From Swiss-Prot:
InterPro entries: AB_hydrolase_1, AB_hydrolase_fold, BioH, Carboxylesterase_BioH. The keyword Hydrolase applies. This is Pimeloyl-[acyl-carrier protein] methyl ester esterase. The active site is at 82 (nucleophile), 207, 235. It is an enzyme of class 3 (hydrolase). It comes from the Bacteria. One of its GO terms (molecular function) is pimelyl-[acyl-carrier protein] methyl ester esterase activity. SUPFAM superfamilies: alpha/beta-Hydrolases. The keyword Metal-binding does not apply. Residues 15-242 form the AB hydrolase-1 domain. Substrate binds at residues 22, 82-83, 143-147, 235. Belongs to the AB hydrolase superfamily. Carboxylesterase BioH family.
Length: 256
């Protein structure tokens, strides 16, 4: 069965859909879901092939976005973390009428380093793909450790991420590989210049996967968007700075 796992909480007049990152599932939001569901009608989603959304193989970004949209409210703020940021961005590009505001968290329109564009070196992503077939649990754990490195709470944040992964069955290797392929190949820098809705980009100053150098570059490329950097966060600011993170989303709600 190809079913997207979807949970709705709260009674707010604005809908907020949260999309998680690579290798993870919607349990990653448990540190903030109570707070957010007191302000929004909150939608927690396991991306196709991840967590409880079983029965999917590797999907393209476009197919992943369409699969998620089928169960979504008519209009919502879409928030995507890391890989989820690409999915939310794709939805904003193809179905702008469904997106009240777009929020990307520790995400890049182009994760892979290119000429004069900072990002993850393509051989690092290719290495992760190679290691997946050898020892995919260890590969996922390495990727998670990278996400919290450098923060004051790095160890406990990494434990929180690992617990999220281990709480549910691991995704299939081809699903994980497909997610890495999206991170390796997708480039939405130019298309996102023209999104019509409010667009908020959140970053961690210490993020080892999305270099902070991209922030001023995107400020220039997307002058209609707003950016905010969590000074002491890495790749998962909602885990290390949950109160500050929720404040920003509640403030955004007042503006849309």
């Amino acid at each position: 069965m190809n079913n997207i796992w979807w949970q709705t909480k709260g009674q707010g007049n604005v809908h907020l859909v949260l999309l998680h990152g690579w290798g993870l599932n919607a349990e990653v939001w448990r540190c903030i879901d109570e707070e957010l569901s007191s302000h929004f009608t909150l939608h927690l989603v396991d991306l196709p092939g991840f967590g409880r959304s079983r029965g999917f193989g590797a999907l393209s970004l476009a197919d992943m976005a369409e699969a998620v949209l089928q169960q979504a409210p008519d209009k919502a703020i879409w928030l995507g973390w890391s890989l989820g940021g690409l999915v939310a961005s794709q939805i904003a590009l193809t179905h702008p009428e469904r997106v009240q505001a777009l929020v990307t968290v520790a995400s890049s329109p182009c994760f892979s380093a290119r000429d004069e564009w900072p990002g993850i070196k393509p051989d690092v992503l290719a290495g992760f793909q190679q290691q997946l077939s050898d020892d995919f649990q260890r590969t996922v754990e390495r990727f998670l450790a990278l996400q919290t490195m450098g923060t004051e709470t790095a160890r406990q944040d990494a434990r929180a991420l690992k617990k999220t992964v281990l709480a549910l069955p691991m995704p299939e290797v081809d699903v994980l590989n497909g997610g890495l392929e999206i991170l390796k190949t997708v480039d939405l820098r130019q298309p996102l210049q023209n999104v019509p809705m409010p667009f908020l980009r959140l970053y961690g100053y210490l993020d080892g996967l999305v270099p902070r150098k991209v922030v001023p570059m995107l400020d220039k490329l997307w002058p209609h968007s707003e950016s905010y950097i969590f000074a002491k966060a890495a790749h998962a600011p909602f885990i290390s700075h949950p109160v500050e993170f929720c404040h920003l989303l509640v403030a955004l709600k007042q503006r849309v």
